Design a protein with these regions (language model features):
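Coupling/switch/interface segments within P-loop NTPase motor domains and analogous charged loops
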Residues: 136, 146-198, 349-430
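Short amphipathic alpha-helical boundary/capping segments
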Residues: 12-15, 240-245, 359-366
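Active-site-adjacent loop/helix micro-motif of nuclease/hydrolase catalytic cores
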Residues: 86-92, 371, 642, 655-660
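Basic, Lys/Arg-enriched alpha-helical interface segments
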Residues: 1-62, 68-215, 397-400
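Conserved helicase motor core of SF1/SF2 NTP-dependent helicases
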Residues: 243, 247-293, 300-344, 348, ...
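A short, compositionally biased micro-patch
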Residues: 48, 57-61, 69, 516, ...
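Accessory N-terminal region flanking or inserted into the helicase ATPase core
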Residues: 209-248, 255, 262-265, 369-453
Length: 706
């Protein structure tokens, strides 16, 4: 017998009253063991349009709805609810195998009947109407995209994008996505490739529901439950659908048999991190299954590493998780070097500033070079290239620098850099990029063999070239060795790198995710305009764009509130959060974001003044959803998180962009990059929102807001 659970069932289970969940859970466990057990009584749903739907009694209040085709051993748990509500749900649904795609689809019975009735009416008299949105698309193409034959008339009646949105609930998800892309101007072949559809038509048996469950589109909404452990994991976190249900394109990337490093790009909300998490699980479970095999999952910040580890705990069992090491790269380097007697410690900003002041005392005034120039030259030229002598500096390219200097100026400037390096050494200090370089050189010179079979990298856009060289040294070159996901539109740190120049060859192994499943189109559009006209790299020497990057949901436009004073903003924040909660939003689904810690303190004061509970998501701490309260965090901290509602507070001039971050002296290139980074930070903050985004400020507002 084959038992499966739908995504709808899990969502419905999460809404079951706590006093009944234990009873429902006991029923599900019994059902998985044997759906034909004597204690399970099946009752046909009398008014159901689908004869394969049955009601099963759980207790006096609750009923489960089961799809069980006659003469099969297939049992699908599709819904759970109070008695009358469960029956009403079953009466509204029909289950079909799409003969053109092979997917098991759940359709609204009313929509099917309405479409069939419309065909009858249209045959009697065809009233004049506007040309349809899909008038140029043939029926067989619509069917190949997953449009049920019964709903082709519904699609033909769609006149514009608003009509398409109104028809969304009636259509299978894969059909809606294809129609959305067609409406956006993509040709049929491009849509087939983007959605991982076969280029040739598929002939499927419409009565074979068991085979249909294996279809990639079916796996977006149904999961076959094979054992009690897997079932328990599902029921423990029924709302974490990302753990089980993947888009076919995501599923393909997760299991790709890569003959070397692989790179995945994608805008905010396209599921890059979800792909990386599932990829790590796939690697230890399938590609490198030996008990001694290890995978390194790394990212740029401790915050993200903490969040990733928490997510992997929900995705992997203890045995698999024990073979995935999750750590941000700087921490890995520190641990690696410390274990080998490394005598240097990382230098932090306060110490570094003092050392720079000492070194700048050697700067010759005749060159006219500012103190900002020296620090930027160090960060942009000397450190990325690992320059350690004047001779190397004289020969080094200075790509990306706006201030031109000749040989004489380089010779005059070098003593400053040499002195800064000398002072670091005297105090037993190194910058992190030096430590990364030292770790790589130690591995290469001593031939150290590390236990890792593969490395998975999240937020790759924030890694430096030296970091990528180290990553290349961590694992031997071979199939499925390195898997990177990133998006340079979300680069909020200064590093840039070209993978190919770091020994990571991704030629022929690079893909892009374009469908945003998190953010509404209104939020996406607002965020995208922040970076329009700015060249964004693809991590490998080329340019990336957001062509085809689109959201499949809609909602309210982003609101910008320009208040007169700090007191006015304080009152507004409290009032707006209360309005969201009154409309049904959970406080934990709301996050107020600030550019600086000072702004975060202002937000906390505003929430306290409104008598609202709050929970600050701090650095190196996870967002524990069990903790009550409106979330408050810095822009940097919310990277990698998501919320239903996001408010960006104090979007004032000199705060966004932050005045300190914009200091670039006379270097126009550094200034442009700094502004792009500040714009990217606001882009990241806004795209954490799933349903609504609001920006507020007082006095002079951020120039980014127009």
């Amino acid at each position: 017998m084959k038992v499966a659970i739908s995504d709808d069932f899990l969502l419905a289970f999460s809404d079951v009253q706590k006093t009944h969940q234990k009873k429902v859970r006991e029923f599900i466990e019994l059902f998985r063991e044997n759906p034909e057990a004597g204690g399970i009584q099946y009752h046909p749903v009398r008014k159901a349009r689908d004869p394969n739907l049955y009601s099963v009694r759980i207790d006096q209040a609750y009923r489960a709805i089961v799809f069980h085709p006659a003469d099969t051993d297939l049992y699908l748990l599709t819904w759970v609810d109070h008695h009358d509500d469960a029956y009403a749900w079953a009466e509204r649904k029909v289950f079909r195998v799409n003969p053109m795609t092979g997917a098991l689809q759940v359709l609204a019975a009313d929509a099917v009947e309405a479409a069939e009735a419309a065909v009858i009416v249209s045959k009697k008299a065809a009233p004049a109407r506007k040309a349809g949105l899909f008038r140029k698309v043939k029926d067989d193409v619509l069917l190949r995209f997953g449009v049920p034959v019964e709903l082709v008339p519904t699609v033909r009646a769609i006149d514009d994008e608003e009509g398409l949105e109104e028809s969304r609930e009636a259509l299978p998800q894969e059909a809606y996505e294809a129609l959305y892309l067609l409406a956006a101007g993509y040709d049929a072949d491009t849509v087939l490739r983007e959605l991982e559809k076969p280029m040739e038509p598929v002939a499927a048996d419409p009565t074979d529901f068991t085979t249909a469950l294996q279809n990639d589109d079916s796996k977006r909404r149904f999961v076959v439950v094979s054992d009690a452990k897997e079932l328990a994991e599902l029921l423990n976190a029924p709302l974490d659908l990302w753990r089980v249900f993947l888009h076919p394109k995501q599923r393909k990337l997760v299991s790709v048999a890569a003959n070397g490093p692989y790179r995945v790009l994608g805008g905010a909300g396209t599921g890059k991190t979800v792909v990386a998490l599932h990829r790590a699980k796939h690697l230890v479970e399938t590609v490198f299954p030996a008990s001694t095999d290890r995978i390194l999952f790394t990212t740029f910040t401790r915050n993200l590493a903490t969040d990733i580890h928490e997510n992997l705990k929900t995705l992997c069992g203890p045995e698999l998780l024990s073979r995935i090491e999750v750590v941000n790269l700087d921490a890995w380097v520190s641990n690696f070097l410390k274990a080998r007697g490394y005598r240097f410690e990382p230098v932090f900003d306060g110490e570094g500033n003092e050392l720079w002041e000492n070194a700048l005392a050697l700067a010759p005034p005749e060159t006219g070079l500012s103190s900002d120039f020296y620090r930027q030259e160090w960060d942009e030229v000397i450190q990325p290239q690992g320059l350690s002598s004047l001779d190397e500096y004289l020969k080094a390219p200075r790509l990306g620098r706006g201030t031109k200097i000749g040989r004489a100026a380089r010779e005059a400037a070098w003593p400053v850099f040499r002195e800064y390096r000398s002072q670091l050494t005297e105090r037993g200090k190194r910058e992190y990029i030096d430590m990364i370089r030292d770790a790589r050189q130690l591995i290469e010179k001593q031939g150290i063999r590390l236990p890792y079979k593969a490395v998975v990298v999240d937020e790759a856009q924030d890694m430096s070239a030296e970091a990528f060289r180290l990553i290349r040294a961590l694992v031997p070159a071979g199939p499925s060795d390195i898997f990177l996901v990133g998006d340079a539109h979300q680069r909020i740190y200064r590093y840039r790198a070209t993978l190919g120049k770091c020994g990571i060859d991704i030629r022929g192994r690079a893909r892009k995710l374009r469908l945003n499943y998190r953010t509404t189109d209104e939020i996406r559009r607002f965020a995208v305009t922040l970076l329009e006209g700015r060249p964004i790299d693809d991590l490998d020497g080329g340019l990336d764009d957001q062509q085809g990057y689109m959201s499949l949901t809609h909602g309210p436009k982003v609101e910008v509130h320009r208040l007169k004073s700090l007191a006015d903003e304080t009152a507004f924040l409290g009032r707006h959060v209360k309005d969201l909660i009154a409309s049904g939003a959970a406080p934990e689904s709301i996050c107020i974001v600030g550019r600086t810690k000072h702004v975060v303190e202002h937000v906390k004061d505003a929430l306290r003044a409104a008598s609202l509970d709050l929970y600050e998501v701090k650095r190196e701490a996870t967002d524990k959803r069990s903790r009550p309260g409106v979330r408050v965090a810095t822009m940097h901290r919310v990277k990698g998180l998501e919320f239903d509602h996001v408010l960006v507070a104090s979007a004032n001039d000199k705060i966004i962009p932050l005045e300190k971050a914009m200091k670039a002296g006379d270097d126009v290139v550094v200034a442009r990059n700094a502004e792009t980074g500040e714009r990217a930070l606001l882009y990241v903050a806004l795209t954490r929102a799933k349903k609504s985004a609001v920006v507020s400020g007082w006095g002079a507002m951020s120039p980014f807001l127009g």
